């Protein structure tokens, strides 16, 4: 599949062929319908100081954590709740599902969380991406993929003032 990949921090992204994602037992594979460009993506892709910001940006990294798309594949343990063709958005991580934080619905506090834009979980600046079924939100029919890609940044703003 095609993806926009970091070649070197501070240089433009390059379109490359990378392997298609494969679903884990409780994962979904999405065909990306829309993906936003977050200010964090811009800052991280330009940051050459290893002591500032996330250290996950590296050559070969695929960013993109504000996205929506269509479910194409469903992992065996997710088939009860998800089907190919479902229109969704997802959180920018996959939690383990087992720890107290995940059990309480606080996957972002999971000690084993896998964050998007890392080697283990490439982002959505690609044709397809892998998401955790627990971290996925179904989009109503009247919500476009472009609007669905705004769910994550809208949630950040909402929770900031809540």
Regions inferred by a protein language model and the residue ranges of each:
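Residue-level signal for short segments within beta-strands and strand-turn junctions
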Residues: 5-7, 46, 73-75, 103
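NAD(P)H dinucleotide-binding glycine-rich loop of Rossmann-like/cofactor-binding domains
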Residues: 54-56, 65, 94-162
């Amino acid at each position: 599949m095609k993806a926009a990949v970091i070649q070197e921090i501070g240089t433009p992204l390059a379109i490359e062929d990378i392997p298609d994602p494969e679903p884990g037992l409780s994962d979904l594979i999405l065909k990306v319908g829309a993906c936003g460009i977050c200010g964090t993506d811009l800052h991280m892709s330009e940051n050459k100081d290893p002591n500032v910001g996330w250290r996950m940006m590296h050559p070969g990294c695929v960013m993109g954590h504000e996205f929506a798309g269509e479910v194409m594949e469903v992992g065996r343990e997710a088939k009860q709740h998800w089907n190919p063709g479902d229109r969704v958005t997802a959180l920018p991580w996959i939690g383990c599902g087992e720890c107290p934080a995940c059990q309480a619905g606080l996957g972002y506090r999971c000690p084993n969380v896998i964050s998007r834009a890392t080697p283990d979980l490439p982002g959505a600046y690609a044709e397809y991406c892998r998401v955790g079924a627990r971290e996925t939100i179904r989009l109503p029919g009247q919500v476009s993929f472009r609007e669905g890609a705004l769910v994550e940044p809208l949630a950040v703003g909402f929770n900031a003032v809540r």
